[in-house]
């Protein structure tokens, strides 16, 4: 486990081979197929670069993978405790789909804590099929969770134009000499620091490539109040632009009791008092490690 921790802290990601049992993998494939069958063309078009982005808040059937009994021991073995769960997504790239844009998934770069060694968010990426560059495997810039890289200068990677893959000539979609392809076998787990620059190759095969990405929050109560409050809003899905006459979409707190009770202990809670909104997706080069 110490070698796993060393590689994770150095590179910002690590692979745990064969994490899912064959039975669990089969069950997740069945659930995933049902969810994907229910997607309409508008969803696929809106998330063309990712393929799909199905929030677990809408799908209590994923409760068991959130509460997988080996997850907390794994994260604790890496040296992390006081763990909460933030969100989960079914991300599935259909055959003949474009690449995913380069991005990182942290937004608290205005805060000094974002430049520490330990992550604020840890992504657990469960792959439901074998992956390689030809079918859209993950690609990463090792070490970019703590070191400045030219790709940090890209525009905000979570806008509509990139999500819809409107300009595939943009360097946000291009290969980079520093990239590493992360090829896995179905059932493997990729652990990733939320600050790591990553994307995915185009899926040039004819088959769907699916994964489940779950975000966990280590040392949660040690986080600054502003970050805690923002994380709680993301969990509750109240951080979205919602019309005044509409309510927020469902969150795991709204799941049926049988599903909710499996994960309640992992729910993030807000700080004791309100704070100003923290949201800065671009790191400060001067505060990152020098290469």
Residue ranges and their predicted role:
Residues 1-11, 16-116, 227:
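Non-heme Fe(II)-dependent double-stranded beta-helix
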Residues 18-20, 128-132, 143-145, 219-220:
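Short loop segments at secondary-structure junctions
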Residues 38, 196-291:
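Non-heme Fe(II)/2-oxoglutarate
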Residues 48, 103-108, 112, 164-175, ...:
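Short, surface-exposed loop/helix-turn segments at secondary-structure junctions
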Residues 93, 141-148, 215-221:
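Short edge-strand/loop segments of extracellular domains
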Residues 98-104, 111-113, 134-140, 149-153, ...:
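A short secondary-structure junction signal
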Residues 112-133, 183-186, 191, 215-218:
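Short, conserved beta-strand element in jelly-roll/cupin
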Residues 131-197:
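Double-stranded beta-helix
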């Amino acid at each position: 486990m110490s070698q796993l921790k060393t590689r994770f802290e150095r590179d910002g990601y690590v692979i745990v081979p064969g994490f899912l049992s064959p039975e669990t993998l089969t069950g997740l494939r069945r659930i995933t197929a049902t969810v994907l069958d229910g997607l309409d063309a508008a969803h696929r078009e809106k998330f063309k670069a990712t393929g799909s982005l199905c929030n677990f808040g809408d799908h209590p059937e994923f409760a068991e993978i959130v509460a997988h009994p080996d997850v907390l021991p794994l994260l604790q073995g890496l040296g992390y405790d006081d763990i909460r769960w933030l969100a989960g997504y079914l991300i599935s790239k259909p055959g003949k789909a474009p690449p995913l844009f380069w991005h990182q998934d942290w937004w608290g770069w205005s805060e000094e804590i974002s430049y520490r060694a330990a992550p604020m968010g840890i992504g657990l990426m469960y792959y439901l099929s074998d992956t390689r560059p030809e079918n859209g495997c993950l690609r990463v810039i090792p070490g970019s969770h703590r070191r400045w890289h030219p790709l940090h200068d890209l525009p905000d990677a979570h806008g509509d134009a990139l999500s819809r893959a409107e300009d595939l000539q943009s360097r946000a979609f291009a290969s980079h000499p520093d990239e590493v392809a992360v090829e896995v076998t179905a059932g493997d787990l990729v652990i990733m620091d939320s600050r790591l620059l990553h994307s995915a190759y185009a899926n040039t095969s004819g088959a769907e490539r699916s994964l489940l990405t779950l975000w966990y929050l280590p040392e949660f109560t040690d986080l600054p109040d502003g970050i805690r409050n923002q994380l709680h809003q993301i969990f509750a899905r109240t951080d979205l632009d919602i019309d005044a006459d509409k309510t927020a979409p469902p969150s795991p707190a709204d799941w049926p009791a049988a599903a909710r009770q499996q994960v309640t202990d992992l729910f993030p809670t807000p700080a004791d008092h309100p704070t100003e909104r923290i949201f800065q997706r671009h790191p400060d080069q001067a505060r990152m490690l020098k290469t």
